[in-house]
Structure formats: structure tokens, C-alpha cells
Amino acid sequence: MARMKDKYLALKAELQADLGIKNPMQTPALEKIVISVGAGFAMKDNKLIQNIEDTITTIAGQKASTVIAKKSVAGFKVREGMPVGVRVTLRGEKMYNFFDRLVSMALPRVKDFRGVPRNGFDGRGNYNFGLQEQLIFPEVSYDSVMQIHGMNITVVTSAESDKAGFALLEKMGMPFSKGSN
């Protein structure tokens, strides 16, 4: 079993007591993690899109998929059918393994890291934040990267409020910044 899942099961009762939840089934839990890269800068270069897809697949441990434009938008020089991004959705064991690597290995490698911002919650207990580069993950070698790009990570929880989502992620080891940003 994943180390982070064991940690969650150990702190579930404590989290339930802290939030004043009577039914243990209402205790917030991680549902999925979505990693996405908007690759508008690489629309015309299929090799670069493939490289981004391979990098995200390596980071996530699961095959990433290319996002295709549904409509043409002249202002962005996007045509219907063009690749505009890459994403992967993690659930279950792979989700817990990725979260563990993110919190314990990747985020501490960010230059001048002072914690992830607290204002990334959406009002329903889900958390979004961005990373500036993919090289903070130990799985990615510098030689295999064609272009440095960032990514957006969405952590979807079963929490019904931001307070419950924050409590869950904080107890699971997410390094939030100290300020009230």
C-alpha cells in the first residue's frame, strides 16, 4: 500500500474529530489529481507536444493524453483539431504515490520555496496550484527535455468546504506558505 494512503488512514480519525464530523464516511479524502500543461507555445511542433506528453507520463507514472482544440479561435491562431495541451488524471494508488513524491521530493527542490499559496482553493475544497518547471521531479532528466514548461496541478478532494480541504491537505503534508495569501 502507498505510504501516503497509510498516512491518511492513520490521521482519518484525528481529522474527523478536528472538523467535528460525526459520520466517518463524511471525512474528506483525496479523490483525484489532475496534471495539465497548456502547450499553446508548441501547437505547430508535434515533436515538442510528444516530448511534453512523454515528460508528463514519466512524472505521473501513467500515460498522458493530448488535448485537442474543439473550436478554431483566430485571435490565438488555433485551428480545430490542433493539439493545445497535455493532461493526465490520477486516481487510487498512483494518485497517492504521486502526491507523496510531490510533497516529499519535488516541492522541496523548487528554488526559494516558501510553501504553496493558500489561496488556490475553489470554494468546494479542491486545490489548484502551478509549477514553473518540470525539472523539479527527480524522474525527469535534463537531457530529455526539449523546452522547460510549467504545469497546473489540481487536487480534487471530497471535502465540502475550503476549510476541510485545507485541513486534509495540511495534515497529509502539503507545505502551505506561512502568510495569509
Curated annotation (Swiss-Prot):
Transmembrane segments: none annotated. GO terms for molecular function: rRNA binding; structural constituent of ribosome; tRNA binding. The keyword Ribonucleoprotein applies. GO terms for cellular component: ribonucleoprotein complex; ribosome. Disulfide bonds: none annotated. Keywords: Ribonucleoprotein, Ribosomal protein, RNA-binding, rRNA-binding, tRNA-binding. This is one of the proteins that bind and probably mediate the attachment of the 5S RNA into the large ribosomal subunit, where it forms part of the central protuberance. In the 70S ribosome it contacts protein S13 of the 30S subunit (bridge B1b), connecting the 2 subunits; this bridge is implicated in subunit movement. Contacts the P site tRNA; the 5S rRNA and some of its associated proteins might help stabilize positioning of ribosome-bound tRNAs. PANTHER family: 60S RIBOSOMAL PROTEIN L11-RELATED. This is Large ribosomal subunit protein uL5.
